[in-house]
Each structure stands twice: as C-alpha cells, then as structure tokens.
C-alpha cells in the first residue's frame, strides 16, 4: 500500500526485531492515516528538497514492538506520528536544520549527535494533524537532551567541519 508517491506502508512498518520475534507490527486505520499525514507533510517535502531517497530507519511501532525494544507504549511511533530517518550523502545535522526551517512538525530530535561527525546519529521527527504541533527541537548526545540544534559551520548551504 502506497502512503504517498515515494513512501509505502511496508517501509514505514518494517522492523527486524518484529520479524525475528514474530511480533505483529500492523497499524490500525488511525495509525495508517497518521503515517500518510507524516509522508505528505514531512517526508515528501524533504525528499523533494534534497532530491534523494529518504531512508526510514524506524517508523510505526506496535505496542508489542515498543515493549520489545524498550520504548514507551505512548511513543509517537506507536501512533504512526513519528519516524527516524537518514538521507544517504546528506549529513544528518543538515537534514535536521532543513526540517526545522521548512516543515510543520511536533518534535524534531537530532539523535546521538557528535560534533566531530555531522553525518552520525539520525533524525527523529514527528507530526500530527491536530494543528497543535509543538515545534520542539532537541539534540541528544547519547547522555543528555539539550534544547535546539547545535551551532555548525556552514559554507554554500552545507555543513563543513
């Protein structure tokens, strides 16, 4: 089932943990609608801007899958409202900055950020269509969360070390 031009339900629900443990990771109708909203409002604009495929490293997670991986059952992933992503060839911090400045979102987290490796970690982003997106931006360095994205050096619209 296609959720949008470039994103399918299969890629938004794929989980090696679910496959290995025999966990049903099938979303309900409400979660599928939320995944579609996420695709149209966040992922399609992101793909169009960078003109590269967006890799979903974690999308929808059933409550059973959340429990299996140590995530909260109340996670926005369990509601179909969040994804973790990367774009091959684009530093994750650059992706995070673009998202912060160009789309409506609820929460944006630059996960496992290392200033010496702007391509490291991954980007977590969530969206819900209720109109009450918080626009919360955080950076997680593996130990603690901090508000906002880290300051970076830029040249020609790209992150430089």
Q: What are the residue ranges of the model-derived segments?
A:
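Structural recognition of the beta-strand scaffold that forms the well-ordered cores
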Residues: 55-57, 82-86, 124-126
């Amino acid at each position: 089932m296609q959720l949008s031009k470039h994103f399918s339900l299969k890629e938004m629900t794929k989980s090696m943990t679910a496959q290995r443990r025999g966990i049903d990771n099938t979303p309900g109708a409400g979660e599928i609608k939320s995944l579609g909203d996420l695709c149209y409002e966040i992922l399609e604009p992101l793909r169009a801007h960078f003109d590269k495929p967006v890799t979903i490293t974690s999308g929808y997670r059933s409550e059973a899958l959340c429990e299996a991986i140590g995530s909260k059952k109340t996670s926005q992933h369990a509601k179909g409202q969040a994804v973790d992503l990367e774009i091959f060839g684009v530093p994750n911090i650059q992706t995070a900055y673009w998202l912060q400045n160009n789309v409506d979102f609820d929460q944006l987290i630059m996960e496992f950020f290392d200033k010496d490796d702007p391509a490291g970690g991954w980007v977590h982003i969530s969206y819900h269509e209720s109109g009450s997106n918080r626009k919360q931006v955080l950076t997680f360095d593996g130990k603690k969360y901090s508000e906002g994205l880290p300051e970076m050096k830029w040249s020609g619209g790209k992150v430089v070390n």
